[in-house]
Amino acid sequence: MFPYVEDYDGYAVKRLMLENVDVLGYLSLGYLALVWKGPAVVRRLNGETNRVSNSGLLRYAIIVWNLLLSAFSFFGMIVVVPAFLTRISQRGMLRALCGNNDEMFYRSSAGFWIGMFVLSKAPELVDTMFLLLQGKTPPFLHWYHHVTVLIFSWHTYCDHTSTMVLFAAMNLTVHFIMYFYFAMCACGFKKTMRKFAPFITMLQILQMVVGSLVTTYSAYKVYTTPEGAAPGCHVSRANARMGVIMYMSYLYLFSEMFLNSYARPKKPVADPTAAGKKV
């Protein structure tokens, strides 16, 4: 289906990322500076009329951006997910997760999409720019998720972590749905699409549950492997630690967001006439 990726050289991509690892630091610091200073800059640009936030051009840009990311995730999903399921059927779940497979990771069509998935985490930072231009302040979960995924994905790909295939398959699937949802909301269907929001958050939470279980299992295998023995899982100790911390923090934050947004009852608005106050 994608003949142009048959000669994909993931090792070259890995070398490029390792040789330019400082760029990861610049991106992360620049992004955090954008989150910190961006709201004030946008307020000045907006003026009293919100000329930037209310711009029709901005709305169209948001629609196109989200549709592009949804399409990218869809094409990645339809390659990586079947490849991972085939690997499970051939090797079993545990060996599919923990076994080393250079050919699939760096040479196959699935490897191409895994590599592009990792590299896409840098342009995905533009999500935050669009949020700022709409006059919104990015919540902690938003920017924390973006910057940590960028760092973790970069490290995981360069470290050839075997569990990366599952992480990419899950994330591409969720992002295909999520970015399509954002595009439809920007098109003016927010009221219609709003009913699907809890289910998308539930999908994200499910992704974090699976990620937490897998990273915990891989960390257990890595730390219980005797000195000098073959690793029980093709994951480094550094990546195992990063994975556990990242996925468990996501699980907590997304669960908290779900509870606050959909599960906990909204506080009733106080009646101004209640204590004999005039209105």
UniProtKB/Swiss-Prot annotation:
The keyword Transmembrane applies. It comes from the Eukaryota. Pathway: Lipid metabolism; fatty acid biosynthesis. The chain crosses the membrane at residues 16-36, 61-81, 112-132, 138-158, 164-184, 196-216, 242-262. One of its GO terms (molecular function) is fatty acid elongase activity. A motif (HxxHH motif) lies at residues 142-146. One of its GO terms (biological process) is fatty acid elongation, monounsaturated fatty acid. One of its GO terms (cellular component) is endoplasmic reticulum membrane. The active site is at H145 (nucleophile). Keywords: Endoplasmic reticulum, Fatty acid biosynthesis, Fatty acid metabolism, Lipid biosynthesis, Lipid metabolism, Membrane, Transferase, Transmembrane, Transmembrane helix. Pfam families: ELO. It catalyses: an acyl-CoA + malonyl-CoA + H(+) = a 3-oxoacyl-CoA + CO2 + CoA. InterPro entries: ELO_fam. It is found in: Endoplasmic reticulum membrane. It is a multi-pass membrane protein. The keyword Lipid metabolism applies. Its EC number is 2.3.1.-. Involved in the synthesis of fatty acids. Elongates C10 fatty acids to C14. Required for the maintenance of the global lipidome profile in this parasite. PANTHER family: ELONGATION OF FATTY ACIDS PROTEIN, FATTY ACID ACYL TRANSFERASE-RELATED. Belongs to the ELO family. This is Fatty acid elongase 2. The gene is ELO2.
